Every structure is written in structure tokens, then in C-alpha cells.
Amino acid sequence: MNALAKFGLATVLVTLAVLSNVLVTLSALSGAHAQIQGRQPEALYWQTFLVPEFGTTVEYPAGIFSVPDGKAEKGIGQRFSSADGRSLLTIYTRENEAGDTPASYLKNNLRVGRSALDYEQVTRSFFAISSTGQGLIFYSRCNFSTDAGNAIHCLDLIYPQAEKRAWDGVVTRVSRSLRPLEG
């Protein structure tokens, strides 16, 4: 193979590598890989958070919520924020002193009218609600247990509305992982 042919092959390989990187970048920008804040799903570093007083566990993306941001305001737990401060996760548990059901808890504690909710699911054992405002999405889920000290196990997520599609999988995974410690 002469030098020109070697140069041509090298140029083709470099061009293919550059095009491959461009395609990956374009694909990532389009949200096709569900990137959140520039991270691929495997780089979200999922961890389990435990509220030991009540045995509440939640899987959360520590790669996003990397900054401990104080104790939970509504019970025993922790707040986490993203490094850029645009997203917030609060995990907490509180005693169900009033003996509320998910429906009665919402009725007594919801700070906005039900018409302001974009999503609402209420069952005998949990509620999940979501609303939007000021460019943000607020999502909350609380599981009610009578066998774990009559506790309410909750999480609140706040994240940019413009990134909803990228956040959908994260919200689903975090929400479904909320539970009392089994054992």
C-alpha cells in the first residue's frame, strides 16, 4: 500500500470516527438516550437512601442529586439538590398521627387546588401527584403503611419542565422504589 493510500485510509477512518461522535452528540441532544444534565443513564450512579427511624428506602440517582441540601422539612429525612441547583429531591418519613388515608391526607394537606394538578393517582396505599409552574415540575408520592409503625413514606421531586421527557424514566424509577424496608 503506498503512502497516499495509507493517508486516504487514515483520513477515512478519522472522518468516520468524527462522524460517529457527531451522530452520538446529535442523538444525545435529541434526548434519544434519555440524558439528564449531560449524563447517560448508566452514569447516574443509582444508590439506596435509608431513613433508619422508619425503614424507608428509595433508589435515587446520586449522579444527579449529588449535593446534600439539609434535612427534610416535613419529617425525618434528607434533601438533595443537583450540582447546578435546578433539581431537588426530598426523601422523608413521618408518623401518620392523624390516621390519614392517602385520600384524606391529600384533602387536608394539598396546598393547591386539585384543578392545578396535572397528574393524580390515589389508591388505598399511596398517592402520587404532579403539577407544573414557573418552568418546573413538582412530583410527590407518599406510601402509607400500617405495618411499619403507621408511617407515611414520601418523596418530592422538583425538576425543569423543559426536561420532562428526559426525566420521565428517572421519576418512574425513583417513585416505584419508595418502600418500607422489608425484613
Could you describe each region identified by the protein language model?
Residues I64-F65, A151-G183:
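Surface-exposed amphipathic alpha-helical segments
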Residues L16-S30:
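C-terminal segment of classical bacterial N-terminal signal peptides
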Residues E42-T48, E73-Q78, Q121-I129:
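Short, hydrophobic/aromatic-rich segments at coil-to-beta transitions
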Residues L29-F49:
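N-terminal low-complexity, Pro/Thr/Ser-rich intrinsically disordered segments
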Residues L50-S104, T132-G133:
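Secretory pathway targeting signatures of secreted, lumenal, and periplasmic proteins
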Residues A103-A166:
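Signature of long, low-cysteine stretches enriched in small and polar/charged residues
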Residues E53, P68, D84, L110, ...:
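Sec/Tat-exported extracytoplasmic proteins
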